[in-house]
């Protein structure tokens, strides 16, 4: 019997004769899902590298690499504890009275739940801006109880000298910024491994950990009362907020001091 070849279906083949129409739609979907998961995995890996410093514990080494987000973020200070905001309690702002030493607060106190995030012993502390470390109290030792009580009696009677304030601040890190302002971090429990005077640090880099050094609880050797005291000193040796007339003005000015994260 004759066959009408003009009515045969036309089959499109590759040079090797493979019929690509034989691949079912499900295989295309599986291939697309595989590519998506590969891209998502790479993106997540990059994000984890940027967040790695905030997950360190026990003084582990911190990479000096700066995530690309740091170079594109707006200028200004980052809060020294990620996620923190201005303390809700005015007593934790600069110029708030400190009657126990006949003076005023010279910085911001991040304590308890007043700053939008819990402040716990060992919470990572970051550099609020690029700068150079000019002080790092790695070998800090607490006063004994007798020395502590003597210091409190002295500042209650006569007010606190700069040396007295240094002892009251506990373990500290100071960072000098390119504009010659100095950031002071106080009451730290520990300093990041490898951090030393003269070292450059970058905004967002972990530099230390929240503690209670230089406080009653620190003297007693407990982990209670954890806080971070953070001061911003101007090149003319005045602290941020010093010339404000009211705490309301300090709070308003502080809103433009910090830009995140």
Predicted feature locations:
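Surface-exposed, glycine-biased beta-strand/turn segments
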Residues: 40-170, 203, 253-261
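Conserved positions in beta-strands of structured domains
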Residues: 132-134, 189, 211
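Short histidine-centered loop motifs in beta-beta connectors
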Residues: 118-122, 126, 176-204
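N-terminal Lys/Arg-rich, disordered targeting/topogenic segments
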Residues: 1-23
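A short acidic/small-residue loop/turn micro-motif
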Residues: 141-143, 190-191, 215
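Structural recognition of the beta-strand scaffold that forms the well-ordered cores
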Residues: 109, 127, 173-176, 183-186, ...
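Acidic, glycine-rich catalytic/binding loops that coordinate metals and/or anionic ligands
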Residues: 57-59, 152-154, 159, 163-165, ...
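Hydrophobic membrane-insertion alpha-helices, especially the h-region
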Residues: 24-43
């Amino acid at each position: 019997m004759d066959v009408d070849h003009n009515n045969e279906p036309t089959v499109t083949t590759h040079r090797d004769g493979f019929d690509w129409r034989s691949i079912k739609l499900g295989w295309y979907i599986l291939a697309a899902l595989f590519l998506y998961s590969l891209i998502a995995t790479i993106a997540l890996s990059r994000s984890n590298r940027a967040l790695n410093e905030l997950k360190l514990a026990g003084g582990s080494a911190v990479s000096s690499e700066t995530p690309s987000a740091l170079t594109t973020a707006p200028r200004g200070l980052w809060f020294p504890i990620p996620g923190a905001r201005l303390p809700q309690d005015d007593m934790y702002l600069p110029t708030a009275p400190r009657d126990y030493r006949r003076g005023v607060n010279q910085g911001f106190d991040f304590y308890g739940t007043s700053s939008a995030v819990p402040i716990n012993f060992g919470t990572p502390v970051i550099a609020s801006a690029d700068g150079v470390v000019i002080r790092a109290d790695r070998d800090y030792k607490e006063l004994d109880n007798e020395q502590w009580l003597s210091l409190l009696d002295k500042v209650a009677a006569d007010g606190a000298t700069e040396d007295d304030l240094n002892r009251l601040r506990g373990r500290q890190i100071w960072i000098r910024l390119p504009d010659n302002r100095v950031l002071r971090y106080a009451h730290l429990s520990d300093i990041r491994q490898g951090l030393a005077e003269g070292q450059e640090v970058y905004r967002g880099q972990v530099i230390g950990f929240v503690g209670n050094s230089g406080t009653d609880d620190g003297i007693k050797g407990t982990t209670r009362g954890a806080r971070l005291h953070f001061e911003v000193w101007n090149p003319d040796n005045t602290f941020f907020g010093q010339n404000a007339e009211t705490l309301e003005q300090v709070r308003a000015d502080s809103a433009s001091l910090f830009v995140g994260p």
